[in-house]
Design a protein with these regions (language model features):
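N-terminal metal-binding scaffold of metallo-dependent hydrolase/deaminase domains
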Residues: 1-28, 325, 329
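Active-site metal-binding motif and surrounding structural segment of the metallo-beta-lactamase
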Residues: 24-36, 170
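Histidine/acidic residue-rich metal-binding segments in metalloenzymes
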Residues: 26, 107-114, 135-249, 261-277, ...
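Alpha-helical scaffold segments that flank or form the walls of functional sites
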Residues: 34, 52-114, 135-143
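Active-site beta-loop-alpha junctions enriched in small/polar residues
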Residues: 45, 103, 123-127, 153-155, ...
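Active-site gating loops and adjacent loop-to-helix segments of metal-dependent hydrolytic enzymes
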Residues: 49-81, 119-122, 181-224, 299-307
């Protein structure tokens, strides 16, 4: 069994409706496998599942351009089916809760169908239009419900006054942050390689902030416990220090980051600074098939390429405990799953979704 202190056992267990009711260490294992709390998918876009293999990968600006064009061609029925297929894949692969970003209907219903809990955030992207006006804010406040709220997409895609308004709320919010070097350059200088995508021929340049994305969020008082920064690939040591002091968590999405040529996120340094780091599957449009084991393996591989290796135990703690902590959930309260046919965390890291047994 995987606890916060590490792997214990062998032993026998009783689980009722996914919840661990008894653990008897030393009685001899009743199954060949490892008992773990379900995974927490710290960052997700269920609605993009049917766009897998259709987007432009490599440069992130090109990816954003392609996904905007593809979204415009999707029918509401395709979006709903995409959400349902992705939710089903998450469930079958051992995920219990998701921090979901979505700007179209379907995610809440799909998660509910498969018993997935978590937080669904309706993304606000308003830079290309007018600021998130008072009437829209009233709608957002009226929509507020357990597990659902409106929230910002990213510092580069939202008006400052809108971001400041979200900062003032006490809502649990997640925001894409420092995903690429181009994003950091855009915010610190007002221009970057994204200009053609981000601004267009008739758009005014983004006001120069002379701040990194993390510094900007700090200046607006967005950073606080209950808030999550997604990606954090291009954060500096001073950014990490700010994050650690503020109480925010981070979502690490290594397969998506690799496919979009983003810098490798300094996960070990963030965790050493006290930042809880969960693992997110992001979207199938950028990361590929929904597979938590593949995501964990890439997290380990990328950390080694960076020269700041994470241990196998680190990866499992992030997947099973730290992502849940970021949502304010005690992972040990369940549900639990069995990874069948494995006897060590190293062996379990090589598992596939087909080896997940829901209890």
């Amino acid at each position: 069994m995987l606890t916060r202190e590490g792997l214990t056992g062998p032993g026998r267990f009783d689980v009722q409706n996914g919840h661990l009711t008894e653990w008897r260490e030393g009685d001899g294992a009743s199954h060949k496998g490892i008992l773990i709390p379900c995974f927490t998918n710290a960052h997700s876009h269920l609605e993009y599942y049917t766009l897998m293999g259709k987007t432009v990968l490599g440069d992130m600006g090109d990816f954003l351009t392609s996904i905007v064009a593809l979204k415009a061609k999707q029918s509401p029925e395709e979006v709903l089916e995409s959400c349902r297929l992705a939710a089903k894949k998450n469930f079958e692969g051992g995920v219990a809760r998701i921090w979901e970003h979505s700007d179209r209907p379907g995610s809440r219903e799909a998660m509910a169908e498969f018993g997935l809990t978590g937080q669904v955030q309706r993304e606000v992207i308003d830079f290309f239009t007018s600021a998130f006006v008072a009437s829209s804010r009233e709608v957002a406040e009226a929509d507020l419900a357990p597990g659902f709220c409106w929230g910002p997409h990213a510092p580069y895609s939202i008006h400052r006054e809108t971001l400041a308004w979200f900062s003032e709320t006490d809502w649990p919010l997640s925001i894409h942050c420092a995903e690429s070097l181009a994003e950091v350059e855009l915010l610190t200088t007002g221009h970057s390689s994204w200009d053609s995508w981000r601004l267009g021929p008739e758009k005014a340049a983004l006001p120069t902030s002379n701040q990194t994305p993390v510094e900007l969020l700090e200046s607006l008082r967005f950073l606080k416990p209950g808030r999550q920064l997604v990606h954090c690939c291009a954060v500096s040591d001073s950014d990490i220090e700010i994050m650690g002091k503020s109480g925010v968590s981070a979502a690490h999405c290594p397969r998506s980051n690799k496919n979009l040529d983003c810098p490798i996120a300094p996960v070990r340094r963030m965790r050493e600074a006290g930042v809880k780091v969960g693992i997110g599957l992001d979207s199938s449009a950028s990361a590929g098939e929904i597979d938590f084991f593949a995501e964990m393996r890439e997290a380990m591989t990328s950390s080694r390429w960076l020269g700041e290796p994470l241990s196998v135990e680190d990866i499992w703690q992030m997947a099973c405990y730290e992502g849940a902590d970021a949502m304010g959930v005690r992972a040990e309260d369940g549900p639990w799953i069995l990874i069948e046919g494995v006897e060590s965390l190293e062996e379990a890291l090589l598992a596939t979704p087909e080896q997940v047994r829901r209890l």
